[in-house]
Amino acid sequence: MARFGQHGTIAGNEHAHRATREVFMGTLRDILATRHGIDITEQQEQILFDDLHAIMEINKTMNLTRILSEEDGMVLHLEDSVLGLPYVNDAPVGLYGDLGTGGGFPGIPLCVLTGRETLLVDSVKKKVRALEPVAEELGLGDRLSTYGGRIEDLALERPREFSVLTARALSSLGSLLELASPLLRKGGRLVCYKAQPTEEELEIAFGIMKPLGFELVCDDSHELSDGSTRRIFVFQKAANPRIALPRRVGMAQRNPLMPVDFAQKSGQKSKKRR
């Protein structure tokens, strides 16, 4: 499998890739099964390693990821990405989007394992364009596409089209809730991968989730095989947001919504009713 062209993916270093894959084949499956209770096939594992190798090769000429070795990538990209599989599978049937996909993680692995129609989203167009030939060579071209642009613009173009979204190391939970709300249909889910969110971040997110139309489905902690901790938060779209979304591009990060914003709006409405 896997022959790429001049951007220097798998074809440029096939011997090294085969050697690395021979060393690690089976290891990822064992880790996922024993540590996380997730089963994948040998063929799926091979596709995931081909994906990782392709991204590592592209990364030599384009900054897709800060992780520079396939050994580290097996844990910090593949194992980490696949942690989201049960949560994505629990979401309603339909379109899956990976927000801020970067090097295609967790989007490509979850496309491989779920079989869902998938959209990889990143504001840097050249990043998602670099992922397109990778997807083709992995046999995902019929169900995986890319969007190079801002999430707010995507929400205007494709409102309420998504059944499930993922976001890994992209922004604060509160900002992610705001960005995801206009994209998700009712009943859709947002799966957020976080390392160690602060109490302040959690307080803000939990304080604005209901006004944005969400309810918390789960907050799970996982330990990766390198000893690091990953928390996965899953929010379900239960209602329409109380405010018009999306706001202008960048507002979710530059001027994030706070619980007090909605308390003030409720107070203003109460005064008007009185």
Give, region by region, the residue ranges found by the protein language model:
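Class I SAM-dependent transferase core
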Residues: 2-8, 13-97, 126-142
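Short loop/edge segments at beta-strand edges and connector loops
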Residues: 68, 147-149, 218-220
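Conserved SAM/SAH cofactor-binding pocket of Class I
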Residues: 82-169, 177-178
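Short alpha-helix immediately C-terminal to the canonical SAM-binding loop
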Residues: 127-129, 198, 202
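Conserved beta-strand signature within the Rossmann-like core of class I S-adenosyl-L-methionine
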Residues: 187-197
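SAM/dcSAM-binding transferase cores
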Residues: 205-274
